[in-house]
Amino acid sequence: MIGYVTIGTTDMEKAKAFYSQLLEPLGAKVIMDIGRIAFIGSGMDQPMLAVCVPYDESDPAPGNGNMLAFPAGSREDVDKLYAKAIELGATDEGEPGERMPTFYGGYFRDPDGNKAVFYQMG
């Protein structure tokens, strides 16, 4: 249903490095890079994350109420991936834990301030 989600960045090289290293355990890598925008994922036929310098050249701004959500595979993987995000320069928005019955997640903001979560349902 979702082809890709785009987030803005002020530093393409830093954003590509952050997300390709962070999402590598999930099988993701930079699969297309055309300078101003790069797509990170496991294949062109799978959902992707795109990082880009805004087309209008204005500063990117994280949205209020927007969040990237990455399925981690297990609670242990949530813990590992959250820790890796922090190690790569993300800031904490909520350490891994159970948020409601059947939902376990760890929240962070990437170096550009975009909010994200690694989660496990069930």
Predicted regions and their residues:
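Short beta-strand micro-motifs in enzyme catalytic cores
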Residues: 38, 66, 102-106
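Charge-dense, helix-prone N-terminal extensions
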Residues: 21, 25, 29, 71, ...
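N-terminal beta-strand motif that seeds the catalytic metal site of vicinal oxygen chelate
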Residues: 1-16, 68, 121-122
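Core segments of cupin and vicinal oxygen chelate
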Residues: 7-48
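Long, continuous compositionally biased terminal/linker segments
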Residues: 40-80
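Short glycine-enriched loop/turn motifs at secondary-structure junctions
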Residues: 1, 61-64, 100
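Conserved active-site tyrosine of GNAT-family acetyltransferases
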Residues: 15-19, 85, 113
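Vicinal oxygen chelate
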Residues: 86-122
